[in-house]
Amino acid sequence: MARKWLNLFAGAALSFAVAGNALADEGKITVFAAASLTNAMQDIATQFKKEKGVDVVSSFASSSTLARQIEAGAPADLFISADQKWMDYAVDKKAIDTATRQTLLGNSLVVVAPKASVQKDFTIDSKTNWTSLLNGGRLAVGDPEHVPAGIYAKEALQKLGAWDTLSPKLAPAEDVRGALALVERNEAPLGIVYGSDAVASKGVKVVATFPEDSHKKVEYPVAVVEGHNNATVKAFYDYLKGPQAAEIFKRYGFTIK
Protein backbone atom coordinates (compact mmCIF):
# COMPACT_ATOMS: atom_id res chain seq x y z
CA MET A 1 0.00 0.00 0.00
CA ALA A 2 2.81 2.39 0.93
CA ARG A 3 4.49 1.71 -2.41
CA LYS A 4 1.19 2.38 -4.21
CA TRP A 5 0.82 5.85 -2.64
CA LEU A 6 4.49 6.59 -3.23
CA ASN A 7 4.03 5.80 -6.91
CA LEU A 8 0.93 8.03 -7.08
CA PHE A 9 2.73 10.99 -5.48
CA ALA A 10 5.72 10.46 -7.76
CA GLY A 11 3.41 10.44 -10.77
CA ALA A 12 1.69 13.64 -9.64
CA ALA A 13 5.02 15.38 -9.07
CA LEU A 14 6.16 14.32 -12.54
CA SER A 15 2.92 15.66 -14.06
CA PHE A 16 3.39 19.08 -12.42
CA ALA A 17 7.02 19.18 -13.55
CA VAL A 18 6.06 18.31 -17.13
CA ALA A 19 3.31 20.99 -17.10
CA GLY A 20 5.77 23.58 -15.82
CA ASN A 21 8.34 22.64 -18.46
CA ALA A 22 5.68 22.78 -21.18
CA LEU A 23 4.90 26.38 -20.22
CA ALA A 24 8.56 27.31 -20.09
CA ASP A 25 9.14 25.80 -23.54
CA GLU A 26 6.55 28.15 -25.06
CA GLY A 27 8.70 31.18 -24.22
CA LYS A 28 7.92 34.57 -22.72
CA ILE A 29 4.63 36.42 -22.25
CA THR A 30 4.32 40.07 -23.29
CA VAL A 31 1.89 42.24 -21.33
CA PHE A 32 0.84 45.77 -22.24
CA ALA A 33 -0.31 47.34 -18.97
CA ALA A 34 -1.41 50.78 -17.79
CA ALA A 35 1.43 52.77 -16.20
CA SER A 36 -0.21 52.69 -12.77
CA LEU A 37 0.31 48.92 -12.70
CA THR A 38 4.10 49.14 -13.00
CA ASN A 39 5.15 48.08 -9.50
CA ALA A 40 2.48 45.45 -8.97
CA MET A 41 3.01 43.82 -12.35
CA GLN A 42 6.77 43.71 -11.89
CA ASP A 43 6.33 41.86 -8.60
CA ILE A 44 3.75 39.50 -10.10
CA ALA A 45 6.02 38.75 -13.06
CA THR A 46 8.86 37.89 -10.69
CA GLN A 47 6.61 35.57 -8.67
CA PHE A 48 5.23 33.89 -11.80
CA LYS A 49 8.77 33.29 -13.07
CA LYS A 50 9.69 31.59 -9.80
CA GLU A 51 6.62 29.38 -9.86
CA LYS A 52 6.29 28.57 -13.56
CA GLY A 53 9.68 29.29 -15.06
CA VAL A 54 8.19 31.62 -17.67
CA ASP A 55 9.37 35.18 -18.30
CA VAL A 56 6.76 37.94 -18.33
CA VAL A 57 7.85 41.10 -20.14
CA SER A 58 5.68 44.15 -19.51
CA SER A 59 5.38 47.41 -21.43
CA PHE A 60 3.94 50.25 -19.34
CA ALA A 61 2.39 53.42 -20.76
CA SER A 62 -0.91 55.26 -20.97
CA SER A 63 -3.76 52.91 -21.84
CA SER A 64 -4.48 55.03 -24.92
CA THR A 65 -0.94 54.57 -26.22
CA LEU A 66 -1.00 50.84 -25.58
CA ALA A 67 -4.41 50.33 -27.22
CA ARG A 68 -3.24 52.09 -30.37
CA GLN A 69 -0.01 50.09 -30.43
CA ILE A 70 -1.99 46.85 -30.16
CA GLU A 71 -4.27 48.05 -32.97
CA ALA A 72 -1.15 48.62 -35.08
CA GLY A 73 0.01 45.05 -34.50
CA ALA A 74 2.43 45.41 -31.59
CA PRO A 75 3.40 41.95 -30.23
CA ALA A 76 1.34 41.96 -27.03
CA ASP A 77 -0.26 38.86 -25.53
CA LEU A 78 -2.33 40.56 -22.82
CA PHE A 79 -3.73 44.06 -22.41
CA ILE A 80 -4.65 45.63 -19.06
CA SER A 81 -6.25 49.06 -19.40
CA ALA A 82 -6.87 51.62 -16.66
CA ASP A 83 -10.37 52.26 -17.96
CA GLN A 84 -13.10 50.59 -19.95
CA LYS A 85 -12.94 53.19 -22.74
CA TRP A 86 -9.59 52.12 -24.15
CA MET A 87 -10.43 48.44 -23.84
CA ASP A 88 -13.62 49.24 -25.79
CA TYR A 89 -11.42 50.92 -28.40
CA ALA A 90 -9.26 47.81 -28.77
CA VAL A 91 -12.38 45.64 -28.99
CA ASP A 92 -13.86 47.89 -31.70
CA LYS A 93 -10.64 47.49 -33.68
CA LYS A 94 -11.03 43.70 -33.39
CA ALA A 95 -7.69 43.49 -31.58
CA ILE A 96 -9.04 41.69 -28.48
CA ASP A 97 -10.33 38.18 -27.78
CA THR A 98 -13.63 39.45 -26.36
CA ALA A 99 -14.43 36.17 -24.59
CA THR A 100 -11.47 36.81 -22.26
CA ARG A 101 -12.37 40.38 -21.28
CA GLN A 102 -12.89 40.75 -17.55
CA THR A 103 -12.72 43.61 -15.04
CA LEU A 104 -9.75 42.73 -12.86
CA LEU A 105 -9.16 45.63 -10.47
CA GLY A 106 -10.45 48.88 -9.02
CA ASN A 107 -8.68 51.98 -7.71
CA SER A 108 -9.27 55.36 -6.08
CA LEU A 109 -8.53 58.88 -7.33
CA VAL A 110 -6.48 61.01 -4.95
CA VAL A 111 -4.57 64.26 -4.65
CA VAL A 112 -0.91 64.01 -3.66
CA ALA A 113 1.66 66.53 -2.50
CA PRO A 114 5.44 66.21 -2.12
CA LYS A 115 6.34 64.20 0.98
CA ALA A 116 8.11 67.16 2.60
CA SER A 117 5.32 69.61 1.75
CA VAL A 118 3.56 71.51 4.52
CA GLN A 119 0.27 70.92 2.71
CA LYS A 120 -2.34 69.62 5.13
CA ASP A 121 -5.13 67.17 4.35
CA PHE A 122 -8.27 68.71 2.89
CA THR A 123 -11.74 67.66 1.77
CA ILE A 124 -12.70 67.78 -1.90
CA ASP A 125 -16.14 69.23 -2.58
CA SER A 126 -17.74 72.04 -4.55
CA LYS A 127 -16.27 74.62 -2.15
CA THR A 128 -12.63 73.52 -2.37
CA ASN A 129 -10.39 76.55 -3.05
CA TRP A 130 -7.99 75.05 -5.57
CA THR A 131 -6.40 78.39 -6.44
CA SER A 132 -5.34 78.87 -2.83
CA LEU A 133 -4.12 75.29 -2.56
CA LEU A 134 -1.96 75.58 -5.68
CA ASN A 135 -0.56 78.94 -4.55
CA GLY A 136 0.60 79.91 -8.03
CA GLY A 137 1.73 76.40 -8.99
CA ARG A 138 0.23 73.91 -11.41
CA LEU A 139 -1.81 70.78 -10.89
CA ALA A 140 -0.05 67.69 -12.26
CA VAL A 141 -2.38 65.29 -14.05
CA GLY A 142 -2.38 62.73 -16.84
CA ASP A 143 -3.37 64.46 -20.07
CA PRO A 144 -7.20 64.68 -19.89
CA GLU A 145 -7.42 64.28 -23.66
CA HIS A 146 -6.42 60.62 -23.58
CA VAL A 147 -4.90 59.41 -20.27
CA PRO A 148 -7.47 57.55 -18.12
CA ALA A 149 -6.35 59.17 -14.85
CA GLY A 150 -6.70 62.58 -16.49
CA ILE A 151 -10.09 61.68 -17.93
CA TYR A 152 -11.32 60.62 -14.49
CA ALA A 153 -9.86 63.82 -13.01
CA LYS A 154 -11.57 66.04 -15.59
CA GLU A 155 -14.90 64.31 -15.01
CA ALA A 156 -14.60 64.79 -11.24
CA LEU A 157 -13.53 68.43 -11.47
CA GLN A 158 -16.36 69.19 -13.88
CA LYS A 159 -18.90 67.63 -11.56
CA LEU A 160 -17.51 69.64 -8.65
CA GLY A 161 -17.60 72.88 -10.66
CA ALA A 162 -13.82 73.39 -10.61
CA TRP A 163 -12.81 72.49 -14.15
CA ASP A 164 -13.09 75.97 -15.70
CA THR A 165 -10.88 77.39 -12.96
CA LEU A 166 -8.32 74.59 -13.04
CA SER A 167 -7.97 73.74 -16.73
CA PRO A 168 -5.53 76.65 -17.38
CA LYS A 169 -3.51 75.61 -14.32
CA LEU A 170 -2.83 71.99 -15.34
CA ALA A 171 0.56 70.38 -15.93
CA PRO A 172 -0.48 67.51 -18.24
CA ALA A 173 1.69 64.39 -18.43
CA GLU A 174 1.91 61.51 -20.91
CA ASP A 175 0.64 59.06 -18.29
CA VAL A 176 -0.26 58.98 -14.61
CA ARG A 177 3.27 58.07 -13.54
CA GLY A 178 4.49 61.17 -15.34
CA ALA A 179 2.10 63.26 -13.24
CA LEU A 180 3.33 61.49 -10.11
CA ALA A 181 6.94 62.24 -11.05
CA LEU A 182 6.21 65.98 -11.33
CA VAL A 183 5.04 66.00 -7.71
CA GLU A 184 7.88 63.76 -6.53
CA ARG A 185 10.38 66.21 -8.04
CA ASN A 186 8.55 69.12 -6.42
CA GLU A 187 7.82 70.59 -9.85
CA ALA A 188 4.11 70.71 -9.00
CA PRO A 189 2.64 71.35 -5.54
CA LEU A 190 -0.26 68.96 -6.12
CA GLY A 191 -1.12 66.14 -8.49
CA ILE A 192 -4.09 63.91 -9.23
CA VAL A 193 -3.13 60.23 -9.39
CA TYR A 194 -4.48 56.87 -8.32
CA GLY A 195 -4.35 55.69 -4.74
CA SER A 196 -2.07 52.86 -5.85
CA ASP A 197 0.45 55.36 -7.27
CA ALA A 198 0.70 57.01 -3.87
CA VAL A 199 1.29 53.63 -2.22
CA ALA A 200 4.09 52.84 -4.68
CA SER A 201 5.84 56.19 -4.20
CA LYS A 202 8.12 57.20 -1.34
CA GLY A 203 8.15 60.81 -2.49
CA VAL A 204 4.51 61.86 -2.07
CA LYS A 205 1.71 61.85 0.48
CA VAL A 206 -2.05 61.70 -0.04
CA VAL A 207 -3.74 64.93 1.05
CA ALA A 208 -7.24 64.36 -0.34
CA THR A 209 -9.43 61.71 -1.95
CA PHE A 210 -12.07 62.44 -4.58
CA PRO A 211 -15.63 61.42 -3.66
CA GLU A 212 -16.49 58.14 -5.39
CA ASP A 213 -19.62 59.66 -6.91
CA SER A 214 -17.66 62.46 -8.60
CA HIS A 215 -16.37 60.21 -11.40
CA LYS A 216 -16.90 56.85 -13.05
CA LYS A 217 -15.53 53.90 -11.16
CA VAL A 218 -11.82 53.42 -11.77
CA GLU A 219 -11.71 49.95 -13.32
CA TYR A 220 -8.97 47.88 -14.93
CA PRO A 221 -10.21 45.43 -17.56
CA VAL A 222 -7.88 42.66 -18.74
CA ALA A 223 -8.10 40.64 -21.96
CA VAL A 224 -6.04 38.42 -24.21
CA VAL A 225 -5.00 39.99 -27.50
CA GLU A 226 -6.69 38.41 -30.53
CA GLY A 227 -4.77 35.38 -31.80
CA HIS A 228 -2.62 35.03 -28.67
CA ASN A 229 -4.77 32.74 -26.53
CA ASN A 230 -2.27 29.90 -26.14
CA ALA A 231 -1.64 27.74 -23.06
CA THR A 232 1.15 29.91 -21.66
CA VAL A 233 -0.78 33.16 -22.02
CA LYS A 234 -3.89 31.53 -20.56
CA ALA A 235 -1.84 30.35 -17.57
CA PHE A 236 -0.71 33.91 -16.79
CA TYR A 237 -4.17 35.34 -17.48
CA ASP A 238 -5.57 32.91 -14.89
CA TYR A 239 -2.70 33.70 -12.52
CA LEU A 240 -3.61 37.40 -12.59
CA LYS A 241 -7.06 36.45 -11.28
CA GLY A 242 -5.70 34.12 -8.61
CA PRO A 243 -4.82 34.57 -4.91
CA GLN A 244 -1.07 35.13 -5.35
CA ALA A 245 -1.58 38.06 -7.72
CA ALA A 246 -4.49 39.40 -5.64
CA GLU A 247 -2.23 39.65 -2.60
CA ILE A 248 0.28 41.72 -4.54
CA PHE A 249 -2.36 43.95 -6.10
CA LYS A 250 -3.87 44.66 -2.67
CA ARG A 251 -0.44 45.44 -1.25
CA TYR A 252 -0.16 48.25 -3.80
CA GLY A 253 -3.57 49.73 -3.04
CA PHE A 254 -5.76 48.16 -5.72
CA THR A 255 -9.13 46.59 -5.00
CA ILE A 256 -9.96 43.17 -6.41
CA LYS A 257 -13.05 42.81 -8.60
Swiss-Prot record:
GO terms for molecular function: ABC-type molybdate transporter activity; molybdate ion binding; molybdenum ion binding; tungstate binding. Induction: Expression is up-regulated by molybdate limitation. Repressed by molybdate-bound ModE. Gene3D superfamilies: Periplasmic binding protein-like II. Residues 1-24 form the signal peptide. Changing D175N: Reduced binding affinity for perrhenate. Molybdate binds at S36, S63, A149, V176, Y194. Keywords: Chromate resistance, Metal-binding, Molybdenum, Periplasm, Signal, Transport, Tungsten. May be useful in radiopharmaceutical applications as an engineered disulfide bond-containing protein with increased affinity for perrhenate. May be used to remove chromate, which is toxic to many biological systems, from environmental aqueous solutions. Changing S36E: Slightly reduced chromate removal from a buffered solution. It is found in: Periplasm. Disulfide bonds: none annotated. Changing S63A: Loss of chromate removal from a buffered solution. One of its GO terms (cellular component) is ATP-binding cassette (ABC) transporter complex, substrate-binding subunit-containing. GO terms for biological process: molybdate ion transport; response to chromate; tungstate ion transport. Disruption phenotype: Cells are unable to transport molybdate unless high levels of it is supplied in the culture medium. InterPro entries: ModA (IPR005950), ModA/WtpA (IPR050682). The complex is composed of two ATP-binding proteins (ModC), two transmembrane proteins (ModB) and a solute-binding protein (ModA). Belongs to the bacterial solute-binding protein ModA family. Part of the ABC transporter complex ModABC involved in the transport of molybdenum into the cell. Binds molybdate with high affinity in vitro and with a similar affinity in vivo. Binds tungstate with high affinity in vitro. Binds unnatural anion perrhenate with high affinity in vitro. Does not bind sulfate, phosphate, arsenate, selenate, chlorate, metavanadate, nitrate, perchlorate, permanganate or carbonate. PANTHER family: MOLYBDATE-BINDING PERIPLASMIC PROTEIN, MOLYBDATE-BINDING PROTEIN MODA. This is Molybdate-binding protein ModA. It comes from Escherichia coli (strain K12). The lineage of its organism: Bacteria, Pseudomonadati, Pseudomonadota, Gammaproteobacteria, Enterobacterales.
